[in-house]
């Protein structure tokens, strides 16, 4: 424990918290333009073709973002909304593309966890028919 004299000479060091999504610059989401849309493979022990896009954000950063859900309509020059959130098995992917916002379509025929994938609520008759 330091003495008062030691604290006068050198004050306590502030703990700095490093951002997990620096490209967003303290914003909840950022708009960007897709520069490349492609698939990549996850690290061991997983195996798949994960859909990702390289996005140039309005903040000036170029980041790799994950496209969640089954199927997408993104291509080069699509305008997308990017949020934070990493993908554990894809190194370097620290952002997600928001489905159902700007040029990104929501996931078709999605009935569970719809808000996460930009899917509209199905009609009452359509939902009953899908269950049977």
Swiss-Prot record:
Keywords: Methylation, Ribonucleoprotein, Ribosomal protein, RNA-binding, rRNA-binding, tRNA-binding. It comes from the Bacteria. Signal peptide: none annotated. GO terms for molecular function: rRNA binding; structural constituent of ribosome; tRNA binding. GO terms for biological process: translation. SUPFAM superfamilies: Nucleic acid-binding proteins. With S4 and S5 plays an important role in translational accuracy. NCBIfam families: rpsL_bact. Belongs to the universal ribosomal protein uS12 family. This is Small ribosomal subunit protein uS12. It comes from Campylobacter curvus (strain 525.92).
């Amino acid at each position: 424990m330091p003495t008062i004299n030691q604290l006068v000479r050198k004050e306590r060091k502030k703990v700095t918290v490093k951002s997990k999504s620096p490209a967003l610059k303290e914003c909840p989401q950022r708009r960007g333009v897709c520069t490349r849309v492609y698939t990549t493979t996850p690290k061991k022990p997983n195996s798949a073709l994960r859909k990702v896009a390289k996005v140039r954000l309005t903040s000036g950063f170029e980041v790799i973002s994950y496209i969640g859900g089954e199927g997408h309509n993104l291509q080069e020059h699509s305008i997308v909304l990017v949020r934070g959130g990493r993908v554990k098995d894809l190194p370097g992917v620290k952002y997600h593309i928001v489905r159902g916002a700007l040029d990104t379509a929501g996931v078709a025929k999605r009935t569970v966890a719809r808000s996460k994938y930009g899917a509209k609520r199905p009609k009452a008759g359509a939902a009953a028919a899908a269950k049977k």
